[in-house]
Curated annotation (Swiss-Prot):
Official protein name in the record: CinA-like protein
A Pfam family reported for this protein in Swiss-Prot or TrEMBL: MoCF_biosynth
InterPro entries to which the protein is assigned, alphabetical: CinA, CinA-like_C, CinA_C, Competence-induced_CinA, MoaB/Mog-like_dom_sf, MoaB/Mog_dom
Transmembrane segment boundaries: none
Family: Belongs to the CinA family.
Species classification: Bacteria, Pseudomonadati, Thermodesulfobacteriota, Desulfuromonadia, Desulfuromonadales
Annotated source species: Syntrophotalea carbinolica (strain DSM 2380 / NBRC 103641 / GraBd1) (Pelobacter carbinolicus)
CDD domains assigned: cinA
Amino acid sequence: MSLNIAILTTGDELVNGEMSDTNTARIAQLLGSWGYIVRESRAIGDDEVEIETALKDMSGRRDVIISTGGLGPTDDDLTARIAARAFGRRLVLNEEALAQIRRFFAEKNKEMHPRNEKQALLPQKTVILPNRLGTAPGFHLCHEQCDMFFLPGVPREMVDMLKEQVLPRLHERSGGQAPRQERILKVFGLSEPKVEEHFSQAPLPEGVELAFGVEFPFVYVKLRACGDQAGALLDRAEMHTRKVLQPFVFAVGQETLAGNVARMLTDTGLTLALAESCTGGMISQMLTDIPGASRFLERGGVTYSNAAKQDWLQVSEDILNQEGAVSKACAQAMAQGIRQAAGTDLGLAITGIAGPDGGTPDKPVGTVFLALSTTGEERVQGYRFSGDREQIRHISACMALEWLRRYLGNLY
């Protein structure tokens, strides 16, 4: 059974720009991992009339509503009262919820504030959703054919309750049937139209749906299948996709480009040193965001000025004067210099013009050179990227990681 699901997030801070609404994205992602599709999402401030109107409207059109926020102990936490009024329930002190709140404080060896008792005032005939990580119990309210789940707005608490309390109930409501499954393959180096063109020439196996998404600079290939054989169908579809798009598929699911490069470096035992100019340390940051990066990353330096390139990397004055700091020759010398200085197996260097100023007719903004130095070979390549300064820097750093991935995977 396919469920028609909506998300409602509440709080002034979400609509006035004080905080980003990360809950909607996280809920949609978790639901998607179970095969459920969100049909609608809304964010509403702390306005009783607006929230009540939204709940009534959505409950008449949706099978499931997942609402977050407004379950705290302060006067502006209004969700339980609004839900009770919207669906003709009395607001009552729920002894089970109160016991949970008291137990939470007792386990923390803290005194419960009288205001926290307000969090146990819930609509009649609701099912309590225990909160292991905070004081605000959630609740499940059913009105006609709509199941409504009210969760706290604190992301950590909300995610835990969604996983432990809500998703199993959705699975039960859908008849225990295997929901739609989705597998996402991540592509770098091809545009969305190019990716789609590849599939038009080599269609997926029957029974697999295809969709695309873009998160600069990546394209996401979304493979979807239903039924008991969904896993096997997606395995076949993934193999097909990798064959059709090789070598541009760099990750699947929650994997990342930096994470896979880190894993490959760890598996091979190779060590790396980085020399960055236009990316200003972005490559180093991407890799050091991965736990255990010290096993393979020996050092990384931002050699922004010509003097730094000469002092730290031994780039010759002739190269800088004749070819320029943004050139194949300079990038190659930077890669050699950092590898020799660090004594590593690999040296990776990048130099370029991120803009908005600094471009010339011969070397416009977006000109970037990458170089890889190893004990056995030297590679250098020039690129012309488009976009604003941040986009050029970001795609340049990603291309550097992609270079490493292809080198380590023998995909050149």
